[in-house]
Amino acid sequence: YHTLLSRRFDRTQEGKRIHFASAMTLLGLEDGDNATNGHGYLDIVDFILQNCTDVECNLQELYRRVAFNICIGNSDDHFRNHGFLLTAKGWTLSPAYDMNPTLNAYQSLLISADSNKANLNILFGACEDYMLNRKTAEKIVSEVIDAVKNWRGLSIRMGLSKREMDMFARVLDERIITEIVG
């Protein structure tokens, strides 16, 4: 069995707490608030615009995460799985967490004003809602696609067994064919 040990992003090296809050908390939302009742990533965009430091960087990072979620089929992208850290300069996106590949064709959250379909073309169409121009959006998505296409090499370097890789292959290869290639 493999065990993943990760460094907590809500603690300093000395063990002191860095304030963390989920997007659900900061947006004043409740469990179950998602695409079905009109909520989505653009709610997070609004929070970033109004409350975050380094707005441009945070918006680009959010867009990158949406693209990644689409590319791996992570539909567990509800508001509790997005968070912010309070730094001396203000709120900033926390490191990404709880991202798991699936074959789902829809996101939990709207990726545009009116769609939660896991589709990069819909995300491209919404790039200005994320305050990005098309060129920047295309660059971000290209980087995400390159990373996802190279999942096998990373898996080998990380020591995943053939059995584990075979489990992920069905999901990731299907997503690559559906979203990236075709």
Name every feature range the model reports, one short phrase each.
Residues 1-182:
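Anionic ligand-binding catalytic core segments
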